[in-house]
Amino acid sequence: MNDFKLTLLRKWEFDNEFSFVYASILLPDGTAVILTSDYTDWHKYYALVLSTEGVKKIPIEYNPTSNRDYPVLFRYKEGFGIIILAKEVWYYSDIYSSPALIPIKNKTLLRYNIVPEKAQQRYFQNISDSQIIPVCFENEVYYGNARCFALLEFDDTAKTAKWKSFSKIDKKAFTHHDDRWADTPKIDSLKILDKRIYAFIPGESASSVNKWGMDYYALAQISAEGKVIEKIIESDNLHTDHKKHGVNGCFTDSEYVILTPVFKSDEWKGNQKVFSLTTREYGNIFLPKGMTKHKLQNITGNLCLTSLFDRGLKEISLCNYSNS
């Protein structure tokens, strides 16, 4: 695969009011929506709609059951939705509309909860080309990671939403899993494409990644029950030397997965790469002049979204790219 060369189209600037880009979507007309939070109060969440008309700030106001029960952003048709507490979807059919408030059903035929009552949503990026939306969760142990996932069936026309399944990923499929602990694989990002479910897995160790590095990472196709169908990427054991290693993965509104190394000391020297689910090849990313500190966030068609964080969110940029 050829390298990605980005050209700047549009830029939105911020004055450190917001924190990180937790998740993003790109609509076909180049409108972007990002999930972020207040820089000084990370429990105040916002959806920022970025278009040619400027920035529209949508406060996401609800009463969380804990400080880590995050809202979840997803793209659906020409609009977007926000999942609140695994109980309700706020669906915006377009960027100008008020949201439709759609309750989520969470019972089996035997009246059992599908998503456990104490499970907590994680805002990690999810992508889907269907009515089934994959969502990251944590359950039983709460460190801000995601070790579970659920599938939400959503229909904006019928205004219905219901949980279909709640699962963990089978660790035994991975070469470097650790049987000494019950920890299941962590999940960075989820994607559904052509009825296939994909997950990026940043290892399973509960130890601090910043302090010790990852134990392994992988990109896999999985079933709704968490069975590993295919390992597309699987790293070596990353704890075999005294260096720290690790790569995070983020699915996009395209065939590409954004790979971000955790440490600048690794073989990628801290530079992001893209990986194609179609060709199974890697590509380098070349940012426009003056934007070398930006991070790629999403890709759709020939458009991509980048962000700059420097003691707060400084810039969001819309670019096009060529890889011919």
Residue ranges and their predicted role:
Residues 7-12, 56-62, 110-116, 162-170, ...:
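Beta-propeller fold detector
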Residues 18-25, 65-76, 116-137, 175-192, ...:
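Repeated scaffold domains used in trafficking and secretory/extracellular systems
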Residues 30-34, 79-83, 131-133, 141, ...:
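Entry beta-strands of beta-propeller and related beta-repeat scaffolds
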